[in-house]
Amino acid sequence: MFSKLRSLIFKLDPEMAHSLAIKALKINSFPKKNVVKSNLIKTTIFGKVLNNPIGIAAGFDKNAEVYNPLFKLGFGFVEVGTVTPKSQYGNEKPRVFRLEEDKALINRLGFNNSGAEKIYSRIASNKPNGLLGINIGPNKNSENRLEDYIICVRKFYNIADYLTINISSPNTENLRDYHNHKQLNKLLESINNEKSNLNSKTPIAVKVSPDIDDENIEKISENLIKHNVELIIVSNTTDSNRQNLININKLEKGGLSGKPLEN
């Protein structure tokens, strides 16, 4: 059954297949009784007990449309986004490419999302039934990226169980400059100042690139500790590790995910 369904899905454009998955989750009901629970895999994070440590990363439910159906399927947590202050289309299509032989995917979506206002309203009107993280980032053409992060912190701090600061997507030009010691220090200092102004205790996570050298790993770690960042998300997609890939789509620009990321 699964192999036949997989074969059918893989005949579709990958972004269309993703859209169909979102639509299917919106209209179907999945009974909770089918979800296996065990005390052996219960996990506590940010003071909340999760039934299991398996969650959905940002990038699947970009616009916070199906987080509750995902909880109903049994996921321990869901992270929505990446959300930017203003809605944006992202990069031009096609922008998602399968590499079947390599068990991988390349995407250059570019933070396509409905924008902070609409996504906030959606979450506020549909209470999450589990741990919900909100992944935030700057608009593509923003003149002040640091301020974009602050706008999103201000918008979502009171409805997110945690906020993820995305500094690592390879599909937003120069975003990874925030891995630089001085820039990251300024960003985290500004976010903590804003949290203080808001009297917010919302935990902060930082999502980093897998392409960091050892020297910068140490510097970034020092920064995260200095600013009391509660969680590190490792990792985003890579723009390296392509030399041994087979599929011709390896030449496409974008972030690589899947099995090659293990190397």
Predicted regions and their residues:
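An N-cap/entry alpha-helix motif that binds or orients negatively charged groups
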Residues: 2-43, 107-112
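Active-site glycine- and acidic-residue-rich loops that bind
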Residues: 138-150, 205-225
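Active-site-adjacent beta->alpha loops and helix N-cap segments on the catalytic face
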Residues: 86-95, 116-118, 125, 171-200, ...
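A gly/proline- and charged-residue-enriched helix-loop-helix capping module
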Residues: 81-131
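N-terminal amphipathic alpha-helix/helix-capping segment at the start of soluble metabolic enzymes
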Residues: 33-56, 118-128, 199
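Active-site cofactor/substrate anionic-group-binding motifs, chiefly glycine-
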Residues: 50, 66-88
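Glycine/Thr-rich beta-alpha phosphate-binding loop at enzyme active sites
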Residues: 22-36, 170-183, 217, 223-263
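Hydrophobic faces of well-ordered beta-strands that scaffold small-molecule active sites
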Residues: 54-58, 76-80, 107, 132-136, ...
